[in-house]
C-alpha cells in the first residue's frame, strides 16, 4: 500500500523550489527595539510592538500580580469556570476606549475574526471581502459557509457594483476589511465603506489589529482616525500588537456582543484569556490613553524614516499611512537575499513572500522605542544594498 503521508515531502520540495519555505527564527531576551537573534544583537524592524509596551515594566508587573492572585491559567471556557473579574474590567476598558456599548475579549485576534464571522452569517448570506484582507478574515469567511466574493483592494466603485448586482439575492450581507492592511501599510476607505453598508443594508466588520493603539487622537483606531465613532459597525482587534499582550476583541452594540457570547464558537468552546495576558492588556490600554507621548514618538519615527527612504534611488516604496513601510522587490529570491544582507548588517527586517503577499517585499515595522540612530543605520544599509 502507498504511504498516505508521502505527499508531505513532495509538497515541501515544491515549497523549497519556489523560495516559499519558512522557518522560525529564535529571538532571545526581552522584546524591544534591539533583540538578540542567532547570538547577534540586531535592530528589530520586524515587530508589531508599535508602542514598545511588550517590555514595559508596568505590563510585566501587572502580569506577575495577576498570576500570583489568580494562577497561570483561566482553567476553563468563559461560560464555565474561566471568567474572572479581570476579563470584565478589560472588556469595559475596550468599550470605553472605542466608545461602543460593549466588548468581548477572545483568546486571540484570529479567534475573534473567525468566531464573529461564523456567528454572523451562514449559507443564505453574502460576504464581500477586500482581496488583501488578513488570512483570519478570509478563513472566517470560508468557515461561515456564506457565499464569498472578493473586491479589488480598496476599490469602492467595484464593491458598489457587486452590491447592486448581488445584494438582493441574499438574506444578510457582511462587508469585511482590515483598517490598516498589515502587509502594505495603507488604510481602508472606511467612511465610503460605511456609506455603502448603510445604503445596501449590510453589516460592516473592520479589523483594527494594526490600528489599535496607533491610529486616532487617543489611539482607539481607524474608526476614530476617520471620525466614524458612533456609526454602526463591528470593530475587531488584537491585544498583541501595540498593546504588547495577547488576545483579541470585538467591540460594538449590546445586542451584538450578547449574541456573540451565545453563538461565537471560538469564544464559547475555548479557554478564557489567561489572567496574566488580561492584566497586561488592561495596563497597556491605560498607558496608551494616559501617555500619548508613546504614540507621538512612534509617528515621529514613521515620518523620519519615510523622509529618508524617499531619498534612496530605485527603492520601490509602497504607499503607506501607518507604521508599516514596505518596499517591493522583483522575486522571492531577491527578497530573501536582501533580508539576508540586512541581517548580516545587524538589521532584522525579514522578507515577505507569496503566498502571504502577491509580490515579494521587505516589511519594516516602526516602534516608538526606535532611536534616530536605529533608523539612520537602516537607511544607510538599504542605500548600500540598492
Swiss-Prot record:
EC number per UniProt: 2.3.1.47
Residues annotated as binding pyridoxal 5'-phosphate: 109-110, 182, 207-210, 238-241
Residues that coordinate or bind substrate: 22, 134, 356
BP GO terms, sorted: biotin biosynthetic process
Annotated positions of the N6-(pyridoxal phosphate)lysine modification: 241
Catalytic activity entry: 6-carboxyhexanoyl-[ACP] + L-alanine + H(+) = (8S)-8-amino-7-oxononanoate + holo-[ACP] + CO2
Keyword Heme: no
Function, as annotated: Catalyzes the decarboxylative condensation of pimeloyl-[acyl-carrier protein] and L-alanine to produce 8-amino-7-oxononanoate (AON), [acyl-carrier protein], and carbon dioxide.
Oligomeric and partner information: Homodimer.
Protein name: Putative 8-amino-7-oxononanoate synthase
Species for this entry: Trichormus variabilis (strain ATCC 29413 / PCC 7937) (Anabaena variabilis)
Lineage: Bacteria, Bacillati, Cyanobacteriota, Cyanophyceae, Nostocales
Amino acid at each position: 500500500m502507498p504511504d498516505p503521508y508521502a505527499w508531505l515531502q513532495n509538497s515541501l520540495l515544491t515549497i523549497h523550489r519556489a523560495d516559499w519555505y519558512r522557518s522560525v527564527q529564535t529571538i532571545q531576551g526581552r522584546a524591544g527595539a534591539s533583540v538578540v537573534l542567532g547570538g547577534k544583537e540586531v535592530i528589530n524592524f520586524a515587530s508589531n510592538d508599535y508602542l514598545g509596551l511588550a517590555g514595559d515594566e508596568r505590563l510585566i508587573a501587572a502580569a506577575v500580580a495577576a498570576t500570583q492572585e489568580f494562577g497561570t491559567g483561566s482553567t476553563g471556557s468563559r461560560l464555565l469556570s474561566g471568567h474572572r473579574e479581570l476579563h470584565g474590567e478589560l472588556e469595559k476598558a475596550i468599550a470605553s476606549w472605542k466608545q461602543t456599548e460593549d466588548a468581548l475579549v477572545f483568546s486571540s485576534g484570529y479567534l475573534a475574526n473567525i468566531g464573529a464571522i461564523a456567528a454572523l452569517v451562514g449559507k443564505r448570506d453574502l460576504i464581500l471581502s477586500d482581496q488583501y484582507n488578513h488570512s483570519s478574515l478570509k478563513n472566517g469567511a470560508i468557515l461561515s459557509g456564506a457565499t464569498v466574493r472578493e473586491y479589488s483592494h480598496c476599490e469602492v466603485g467595484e464593491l458598489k457594483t457587486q452590491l447592486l448586482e448581488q445584494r438582493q439575492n441574499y438574506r444578510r450581507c457582511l462587508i469585511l476589511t482590515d483598517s490598516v492592511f498589515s502587509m502594505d501599510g495603507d488604510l481602508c476607505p472606511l467612511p465610503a465603506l460605511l456609506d455603502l453598508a448603510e445604503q445596501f443594508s449590510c453589516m460592516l466588520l473592520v479589523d483594527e489589529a494594526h490600528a489599535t493603539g496607533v491610529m486616532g487622537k487617543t489611539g482607539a483606531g481607524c474608526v476614530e482616525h476617520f471620525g466614524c465613532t458612533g456609526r454602526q459597525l463591528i470593530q475587531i482587534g488584537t491585544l498583541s500588537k501595540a498593546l504588547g499582550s495577547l488576545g483579541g476583541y470585538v467591540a460594538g452594540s449590546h445586542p451584538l456582543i450578547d449574541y456573540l457570547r451565545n453563538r461565537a464558537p471560538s469564544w464559547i468552546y475555548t479557554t478564557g484569556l489567561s489572567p496574566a495576558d488580561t492584566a497586561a492588556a488592561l495596563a497597556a490600554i491605560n498607558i496608551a490613553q494616559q501617555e500619548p507621548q508613546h504614540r507621538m514618538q512612534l509617528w515621529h519615527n514613521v515620518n523620519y524614516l519615510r523622509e529618508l527612504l524617499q531619498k534612496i534611488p530605485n527603492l520601490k516604496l509602497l504607499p503607506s499611512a501607518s507604521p508599516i513601510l514596505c518596499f517591493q522587490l522583483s522575486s522571492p529570491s531577491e527578497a530573501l537575499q536582501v533580508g539576508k544582507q540586512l541581517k548580516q548588517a545587524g538589521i532584522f527586517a525579514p522578507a515577505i513572500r507569496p503566498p502571504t503577499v502577491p509580490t515579494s517585499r521587505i516589511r519594516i515595522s516602526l516602534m516608538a522605542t526606535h532611536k534616530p540612530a536605529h533608523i539612520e543605520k537602516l537607511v544607510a544599509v538599504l542605500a548600500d544594498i540598492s
